[in-house]
Amino acid sequence: MSKNSKAYREAAEKVDRTKLYTPLEAAKLAKETSSKKQDATVEVAIRLGVDPRKADQMVRGTVNLPHGTGKTARVAVFAVGEKAEQAQAAGADIVGSDDLIEKIQGGFLDFDAAIATPDQMAKVGRIARVLGPRGLMPNPKTGTVTPDVAKAVQDIKGGKINFRVDKQANLHFIIGKASFDETKLAENYGAALDEVLRAKPSSSKGRYLKKVTVSTTTGPGIPVDPSVTRNFTEA
């Protein structure tokens, strides 16, 4: 839905810009303002009160959404031998080592998440400049550098998402599809926000959640009350 289209303007008119919606209200309105031509992804954008330039104010983490993302993630795994077999059995879409690295160096990036066993990280480091900017670099803090590759694959396939603050102190994550019931969207939102709150740096001063917006990939942004940090399914 183009922002210049009549349908988008009509959808945007349904959003009261003077109001801060509850998570449940925002989820319901996101569904109503989404394009009916496709099952759009529902996204959350948060402006944080941190300074990402400071190492001790980096916010990142993972969360298993209780109702999944509505999307089956494509997972690449860097592993060899028995670990490679375990990854394949768990449903990994592509598994390899030097061959996979060479493929990525050649431009292959048809996956949504990457996992590596610890012994592969020295090799994976060769493509850090390719994977890092795209949020695909395996990292122990997000559980994607692990000897238990099978569990890591299953977690991601089951709805595990990663979040990381960007250079502008913004953080983005998805909470499902427009076809989801609004209660499920609100519960996914709550699970993710709980982890964002847990990840608050001790050195962060002042208001941590400055601005929260919910939208679909085809609809307008909906302002959410950042003070609502519990009872997410209440209107």
Swiss-Prot record:
Give one GO biological process term. regulation of translation
Q: Can the keyword Heme be found in this entry's annotation?
A: no
Alphabetically list the UniProt keywords: Repressor, Ribonucleoprotein, Ribosomal protein, RNA-binding, rRNA-binding, Translation regulation, tRNA-binding
Cite the GO molecular-function annotations of the record: rRNA binding; structural constituent of ribosome; tRNA binding
- What GO cellular-component annotations does this UniProt entry give? large ribosomal subunit
> What is this protein's function?
Binds directly to 23S rRNA. The L1 stalk is quite mobile in the ribosome, and is involved in E site tRNA release.
Q: Into which family does the record put it?
A: Belongs to the universal ribosomal protein uL1 family.
Q: How does it assemble?
A: Part of the 50S ribosomal subunit.
Fetch the HAMAP family from UniProt.
Ribosomal_uL1_B
Q: What is this protein called?
A: Large ribosomal subunit protein uL1
Q: What species was this sequence derived from?
A: Mycolicibacterium smegmatis (strain ATCC 700084 / mc(2)155)
Q: What is the lineage of its organism?
A: Bacteria, Bacillati, Actinomycetota, Actinomycetes, Mycobacteriales
Gene symbol? rplA
